[in-house]
Amino acid sequence: MKHFETHRARFERAQAACATRECWSPFPDMPAKYPDSAAAQALGLATFRAHLGGALDKSFVLDQPGGAGEQGEQGEEVSPYTRQKLGIVYPQADPNTLFDAATRAIGSWSGATVDTRIGVLMEVVDRLYQGHLFEITQAVMHTTGQSFNMAYAGSGVNALDRAIETLVYAHQAQHAVAPQARWERQFGSAHIALEKTYRLVPRGVAICFSCASFPTWNAWPSMMASLATGNAVIVKPHPATVLPMAISVRVFRQVLQAAGFDPNLVTLALDSTAEPIGKLLVKHPKTAMVDFTGSVQFGQWVERNAHPALSFTETAGCNTVLLESVDDLDAVLRSLATTLCLFSAQMCTSPQNIYVPVSGVRTPDGLVSFAEVGERLAAAVATLTREPAKAALILAAVQSEQTLALLKHMQAQGAQRGEVLLAPKPYAHPEFAQARTSTPLMLRVSTAERDLYGQERFGPISFVIACNDAADALAQATRDVRDFGGLTAFVYSTDESYIDQAELAYAQAGAQLTINLTGAMPLNFAAAYSDYHVTGLNPAGNAALTHLAFVANRFCVSQSRRPARAKQETEAN
């Protein structure tokens, strides 16, 4: 309970924010606002650099079963900014060793009180923030390609907020179960009195997959959801982005051990792109739950094959934009352009498909043609990415070579089947001359090319799609979400009746809708404690951050009952 009391005020404030859905965070949203920021950033950078091996591989020491590398060491991370290997190798443990250790670790952890577990995990959050935030920021930046600011905010403090938010719901779900009850009723002339005891029983070992582009944002809350409910977690990072999760696992283990619990509640399972072990982990007989964030293909395989384990998935889909009518077209296009560029559209919430009536978009100055809308949007994107210094802040770097190959392929397809409104090209990053970069690709197509845009095209790729009219645009967009998945949606209309139709249609399709938003806030920004991320209603994922359903099925309730004893007897026991 010591840690819970230490963090009680922060936790209770988080509970209040979840109840009201208001804006709150205990963490500064910009690196410069972090306490003693210059010193903290310098220390984080130095710590990150100390991990690097350079020409000679350097072992990341992780004191876990198999930590000496019983199956050797593995590492293949390459910085998207330098295109040089990080030179870090991590111990590869036999999965059976990890499962055995995790299973043994659950006993004392699940026997602790809910508040004790929550307190220890709040201490993990605090330790990550106080001691490792800028180290992880650099690790995220040089494995995913995120900018420094995004790695700090999105993969740092906002991910920590999501972790705390998950703990709030885990606390609520478990405290909803009374630990004991006295039950009495008449059966004929007999009066029956029973003592009932209710126990929270964890499901077992959870596998947590972290993705290549945003490893911590989904993994931290998933880990918290399983651990807070008494389970153990084996983390399976993407081979391209191991370091942020290896640091995280080490911190979890240190805090757990210091609190008197078995650190093997959290371990790291490593694989390579050449020899993946994901399917083996999912189908392992000791796997009770699978948290997966990543590709649509593997996510769908997890959903189909995880049974009898439970699966919690977030993959991707076709995030849609409807342009029906606007008050200020330039403001709308600037906001869209910014969001299309943000982290080179390598986020699961990035918009991709923009549906426009073929007759054009209504504005106070009259109808703007379909062709002009596309051209002005392309021009807005080009303006944002023209200056390398500005492009570096917003586009950052491209995580993988596969994305560049996809850009080339889609550009060729677009030229054959539609029109290339904006061709991609590398830009010169002002700090990292070798950075893997690209400006966005924008294609203009008709709905006849649905096979071209009817899936996530990962990276800075967007489609301006001609629809028969506004009603057809709404029907096409929401059908694509239902069929192919979609996490976010954006509607621009001055017609309240149309907005009402769109709200209902998108709610039924299961995409989180933003209406008529312009200005400084990125359109796809999702606020912890307030915004729900994923609905579970379409193929883009079956779980949501965060509400009770994300945590409540990670534990079960068992009970025992017996004839009521005299008060002194129960007190003696």
Question: Each predicted region: which residue ranges?
Answer:
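ALDH superfamily catalytic-core signature
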Residues: 2-16, 27, 33-35, 251-260, ...
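Short, flexible turn/loop "capping" segments at secondary-structure junctions
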Residues: 78-79, 313-315, 346-349, 452-458, ...
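Conserved C-terminal structural/oligomerization subdomain of aldehyde/semialdehyde dehydrogenase
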Residues: 1-13, 111-122, 133, 260-263, ...
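Residue-level signal for inorganic ion chemistry
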Residues: 83, 117, 230, 266, ...
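Short, conserved secondary-structure transition motifs
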Residues: 269-280, 356, 396-406, 522-527
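Rossmann-like NAD(P) dinucleotide-binding subdomain of oxidoreductase/dehydrogenase enzymes
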Residues: 174-333, 337
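N-terminal Rossmann-like NAD(P)+-binding subdomain of aldehyde/semialdehyde dehydrogenases
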Residues: 1-191, 225
